[in-house]
Each structure stands twice: as structure tokens, then as C-alpha cells.
Amino acid sequence: MLRDVQRMAGVSNSAAYRHYADRDALLAAVTDYAETRLADAMVARMNAVANRGPKAKRALGRLRATGQGYIDFALAEPGLFRTAFGHSGVGRGGHTRQAEGAETQIKSHHPFQILIRCIDDLVAVGVISADRRDGLDEAVWAAVHGLSTLFLDGSLSEADAHRKKLISDRLLDVIGGGLQ
């Protein structure tokens, strides 16, 4: 992908490396850009949820919207979506190891952090009890990411847009229903 961009820009293959310390720094910057764009899409969908009505319904609506934003982004920007998750050890899921055994740090405007805040909101408004909280972030992430990946590169890649929308709606229904 980088070489395609360099060719379109009319610069040499080594030009990008003049701006970064090494290959890992360059890949981290590209990954960060892709993750930020994905997070922006999720937040845009979440912000479109009406801010009136029962708190529980709003919180569930925001969670659903972030999931839909995630799936929509994957379908609209498959290259960026793959880039956000395609470089092992670089920006992987927004996680950065500070030291051996240190807790994982996640940047605040990362798709996973947005999901965490949505689930925290569900606990705060009483949709989910605190004792059911552990593991929900990863479970919801896996479901939405898995479906997005199946749409792009898996057995659902040949499904038409209508079918993908139907399947997305069903998955988001199952997630929302399972949390209540």
C-alpha cells in the first residue's frame, strides 16, 4: 500500500523513511492514522444518536451506533481498516507495552477505548451489573471485528450490500439483547 501511495505521489520508495526513524515508526504512524479514522467514524455514528429518552435506551443506542460505525468503516475503507490491524506489534489495537509486566496503555481516541466507554456507560445506567462487566469489551469487539473481517476477506465477502446490512443488524441486535 505504501509503495502505491509513493508512486502516486511521484516520490521514491525511500522518501517516507526520511521522515521516520525506522520502518516500525513509519508503520506505527500509518496504523495510528487508520485507527484514528476508524475511531472518528464510530464517534460520528455515536453522536448521531438522539440525546433524549431513557438513559438505558440512549446508552444501548450509542453502543449499537459504534458497532455500526465500525462495520460501515470496514466496508467503506477496507484498505484503512486492514491497515489499522495488519501490522503485528505496531499499534496493534492501540496497545503499547511500557515495560515487561506493565499494564497495557490505550490511547483515548482509539476504537477499543470508545467501546470501553460505551460499556462503562451501560454499567453506569444500570443496563449491565458491574459483576457482568469483565470481558464484555473483548467479546463485543470480537463479534463486530469478526463480522467486519468476514465481510472483507471471509466467507461473507460475496454477500451483497442488502445482505451485509441484514447480517449486521442481526449481530447488533444479538449484542444489545444479550446485554439487557
List the predicted regions and their residue ranges.
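Helix-turn-helix
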Residues: 1-25, 29
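Alpha-helical structural segments
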Residues: 8, 25-48, 61, 65-72, ...
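Amphipathic alpha-helical packing segments from all-alpha helical-bundle domains
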Residues: 57, 93-127, 134-138, 166-177
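Short helix-capping/turn signature of helix-turn-helix
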Residues: 20, 86-90, 142
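Amphipathic C-terminal alpha-helical segment
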Residues: 73, 117, 121, 141-159, ...
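Short, flexible helix-adjacent loops and helix caps
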Residues: 43-51, 86-89, 124-127, 152-156, ...
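Short helix-coil transition/hinge motifs at the ends and kinks of transmembrane helices
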Residues: 48-59, 91-102, 158-160
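Amphipathic alpha-helical segments used for helix-helix packing
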Residues: 73-98, 149-157
